């Protein structure tokens, strides 16, 4: 994942490219299997229409892997270009003197406005980290809920507006929390989940992977998971709609 970023940074430094540097929008989703995405062969229809549309317009990797399988170390591998045992972020703890430049540092150095929404504390070696904008607070002063698809569009619009005000191209990292638990409808402390996916799957329609047995509880859990995948896709749809509405879509990678 780091190689395209390094190529982009190299282009940004190049004088001939300096006047037409593209904006950068980096999206992640959390705890989602590749085979939950329609374009990558999901057996359940309609899980990811927005991701599928984006993929149809994009370069796709058929054989991509992460170097470490949990959250904060994985994200810091991506943003450092170093293995966990080299970047010092091997768990969920602060590394005050990592000794390497973060992706956001590199982008700021070449003139980008950097912003992040979601997973802020997991996306850098220590907190607070020097992003130009933390987009977890909405323009109305309310803290954005990590499962609210609409808020991701609002945050994206806010980040783009802040970059325009700074007269810089933007580099926004937008981290969607779904389908990480708690799944859709699993509200901590009980109550009704107000952030309803655009499609809710039934236990009777979900495919059962070969490593699980067909059991009512398994089906119910998978139905909640796939509904949360759909909500993650709703978030992606809101983000991409905000990008299009900003007029910056054609200038953004």
Model-derived features: positions:
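Sec-dependent signal peptide hydrophobic core
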Residues: 5-10
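Formylglycine-dependent sulfatase
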Residues: 2-3, 15-253
């Amino acid at each position: 994942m780091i190689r395209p970023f390094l190529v982009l940074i190299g282009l940004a430094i190049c004088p001939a490219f300096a006047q037409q540097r593209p904006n950068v929008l980096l999206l992640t989703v959390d705890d989602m299997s590749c085979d939950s995405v329609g374009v990558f062969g999901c057996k359940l229809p309609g899980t990811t229409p927005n991701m599928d549309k984006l993929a149809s317009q994009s370069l796709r990797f058929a054989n991509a892997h992460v170097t470490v399988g949990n959250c904060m170390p994985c994200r810091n591998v991506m943003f450092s270009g170093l293995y966990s045992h080299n970047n010092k972020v091997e768990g969920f703890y602060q590394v005050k003197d990592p000794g390497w430049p973060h992706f956001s540092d590199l982008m700021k150095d070449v003139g980008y406005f950097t912003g992040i929404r979601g997973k802020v504390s997991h996306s850098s070696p220590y907190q607070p980290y020097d992003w130009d904008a933390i987009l977890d607070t909405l323009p109305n002063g309310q803290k954005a809920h990590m499962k609210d698809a609409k808020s991701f569009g609002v945050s994206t619009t806010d980040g783009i507006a802040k970059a325009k005000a700074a007269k810089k191209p933007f580099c926004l990292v937008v981290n969607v929390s779904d389908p990480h638990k708690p799944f859709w409808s699993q509200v901590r402390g009980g109550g009704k989940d107000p952030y309803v996916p655009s499609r809710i799957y039934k236990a009777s329609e979900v495919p059962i992977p070969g490593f699980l047995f067909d059991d009512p509880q398994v089906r119910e859990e998978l139905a909640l998971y796939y509904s949360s995948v759909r909500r993650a896709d709703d978030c992606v749809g809101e983000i991409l709609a905000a990008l299009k509405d900003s007029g910056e879509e054609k200038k953004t990678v």
